[in-house]
């Protein structure tokens, strides 16, 4: 698997990954993203800003995420404390096609994200997720992300995590 910048012509495929993840989250009984966010336009905006990335394998695109190297204003206020005050990257909108899930996919994805961040001289990664997203909590624990507290993002409280390499 590889992590590479998303291309404009891949926006629909990336959005389908988001839709597959939405359906998966609903099947688990929670909503990670509201129906009006993220949209395909959100992905096009990510791509235009150079922060949209795809995970691909021999069959093509299997996942999408947004990686921002630098400040996330929503993370300035936290009910808790971040592990580091060094520069960091933020991962948003991480989603995979249903057919691709399992088999160590998240482990490989986070390894690629860490490598990408290190190549950009950043060794801390932050992200947030819904309280109900137990699958992601498990993945983040396994990947040595530490729960840091609550932030307000996208209209409500989110659990904030940080990996400090």
Q: Could you describe each region identified by the protein language model?
A:
Residues 2-16:
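A short beta-loop-alpha structural element at the N-terminal edge
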Residues 22-42:
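Conserved GNAT-fold acetyl-CoA-binding loop/helix
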Residues 49-65:
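Conserved beta-hairpin
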Residues 66-101:
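Conserved acyl-donor/pantetheine-binding loop and adjacent beta-alpha core of acyl/acetyltransferases
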Residues 110, 117-129:
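Conserved GNAT acetyl-CoA-binding A-motif
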